[in-house]
Amino acid sequence: MCRSLRYCVSHCLYLAMTRLEEVNREVNMHSSVRYLGYLARINLLVAICLGLYVRWEKTANSLILVIFILGLFVLGIASILYYYFSMEAASLSLSNLWFGFLLGLLCFLDNSSFKSDVKEETTKYLLLTSIVLRILCALVERISGYVRHRPTLLTTVEFLELVGFAIASTTMLVEKSLSVILLVMALAMLIIDLRMKSFLAIPNLIIFSVLLFFSSLETPQNPIAFACFFICLVTDPFLDIYFSGLSVTERWKPFLHRGRICRRLSVLFTAMIELTFFILSAFKLRDTHLWYFVIPGFSIFGFFWMICHIIFLLTLWGFHTKLNDCHKVYINHRADNNSLDRIMASKGMRHFCLISEQLVFFSLLATAILGAVSWQPTNGIFLSMFLIVLPLESMAHGLFHELGNCLGGTSVGYAIVIPTNFCSPDGQPTLLPPEHVQELNLRSTGMLNAIQRFFAYHMIETYGCDYSTSGLSFDTLHSKLKAFLELRTVDGPRHDTYVLYYSGHTHGSGEWALAGGDILRLDTLLEWWREKNGSFCSRLIIILDSENSTPWVKEVRKINDQYVAVQGAELAKTVDIEEADPPQLGDFTRDWVEYNCNSTNNICWTEKGRTVRAVYGVSKRWSDYTLHLPTGSDVAKHWMLHFPRVTYPLVHLANWLCGLNLFWVCKACFRCLKRLKMSWFLPTVLDTGQGFKLVKS
């Protein structure tokens, strides 16, 4: 007994000590990374102090000494606020502002007369060491998982250091100072572009780096200090391209959730920047040396640029109009836990973004061509504006590209509920006791409420929810289903997914039992679907809560020309009454809706002994399905709806871009692998891409 007790105590102590060592190891690792960051900061401070001291020593400029002493005084105040008054935000803001300002002074003060001085050389090596330590610290932090990524455009540290650096540039002449201030704005745009993981962010970074040290950009006297400032700011967003796990809507949240007025003003701000760039480009016309090339080139490509950017600004305005509509729905349905991306998907934002992506690409192309035609290597203001416009348009292109790829398609749903106990198994009417009638009505009402909840939660447009105790005739059902299957979105194209729910009496072979002895076969329903769907690649998902849904599940697997899925249920034939209640119609609907509408549900479809089992089947080409991509007619309709007639010639160019398919070989191989998976290894849970899943037990 004592030996057992001693063993238990020693084992528990061993586990506790092992866990304590692991925690201490984690804490020590975290502390080491934090101290590495402090070392990089202190090293940079020493480099700045030494560099400013050398400039004061060699130039005897008393203003440098005053600013240097004032900077140390401000940093001392920041330390006091941090350690004695716990005012961390104010302390860090003050220190970051002055770090940017002092580093800017180190860049802009002339050092041509003492470049070979030992102290100046030491300053350069300290700055290079700061760059290495900063990159190493940022990399180790992310590899160790100590960085919590939050949605933001610019961090407070980045903003204040940029402001401080821009203030320091005012020590130069007005034209040079304006060039540097615009360059700082371009750097801010580049940081945001990288943090948003825009599709063209890396090419923009390369272009910015190549142009950064042009003499026309008024590169400071100390390029090492300038490189230190640039690299230290760009390191975090550049590494986050790989390490950040934020989704598209999470990354863009500071912009998408911004107020309506702020977003409208951002379009006007963009228009002002674009107009300024065009005016600066026109200064190239003063170059009389190559007038025979410049004047025709600027006239042609300038006109093309203006048309493309009118389209660009109208696209941004239309995007914000649709986003405002989504925000209204989001505010009204916030209690239903509907996310903004689900609402945007239901409003057809994906289709809008896919077309807008191509239009914004034309704007980027036009800007690049106009910049090349109007290239002014001696005009720093022009080059700085060029570096502002590129990431700005790249961000718009990246936003439309990512939303077009991540948002789900539009969907519409129709539900039919016919109580099954109004007739006997041979189809003859039968009288029911009053209590059974009440139970039947409650169960049918529960199914209607559940499917309406499902439609509302997943933002599925509801065509109707029909409830009939006497059944539906074939003609009535035919007219209703045809009207449902030909529904279209507000923008014109068909919905991506059509969801049809049926709960009612069925025959043994799966046909729906209708009033008057009529039946509806799956073949008949698919004929109507082919007639309405045509060449359009929409999906039809049929959800059956009936006693004989398995035949349709098996039959749908033979279909080769359409994207059709059937989700059904199997009710247990024999049930031990002592262990579980007999299954009834409506039980599957309740569980399936709960599974798809409640992320914290505890429903296990593979659980043994389930009285209601799920089963689904998909057509052979189901895995080939992709959400509808804009066709030439879609682009033309979008153009006529949103843009003036003068821009219509660009429709043909847009249609040509839509028709490009450069990776068809890779796509064909991938399609074969997905078909093999769906035919041989049908997954237990199949994500439809609309927010809900098909399941099998």
From Swiss-Prot:
* An annotated Gene Ontology molecular function: sodium channel regulator activity
Q: Which InterPro entries match?
A: TMEM168
Keywords linked to the UniProt accession: Glycoprotein, Membrane, Nucleus, Transmembrane, Transmembrane helix
Query: Where would you say this protein principally sits, based on its record?
Result: nucleus
Looking at the UniProt entry, the stretches that span the membrane are 36-56, 63-83, 89-109, 172-192, 199-219, 223-243, 265-285, 293-313, 352-372, 380-400
Q: Which residues are glycosylated?
A: 111, 337, 533, 598
Q: Does the keyword Amino-acid biosynthesis apply?
A: no
CDD domains annotated for this entry?
TMEM168
The record gives the membrane topology as: Multi-pass membrane protein
Q: Which residues form a coiled coil?
A: none
- Please cite one Gene Ontology biological process associated with this protein: regulation of ubiquitin-dependent protein catabolic process
Q: Which domain of life is it from?
A: Eukaryota
**Which cell locations does it reside in?**
Nucleus membrane
Q: Which GO terms describe its cellular component?
A: nuclear membrane; transport vesicle
Q: PANTHER family in the record, alphabetically? A: TRANSMEMBRANE PROTEIN 168 (PTHR14437:SF2)
**Main role?**
Plays a key role in maintaining the cardiac electrical stability by modulating cell surface expression of SCN5A. Plays a role i the modulation of anxiety behavior by regulating GABAergic neuronal system in the nucleus accumbens.
Q: Which family does it belong to?
A: Belongs to the TMEM168 family.
- Tell me the protein's name: Transmembrane protein 168
Q: Tell me the organism.
A: Mus musculus
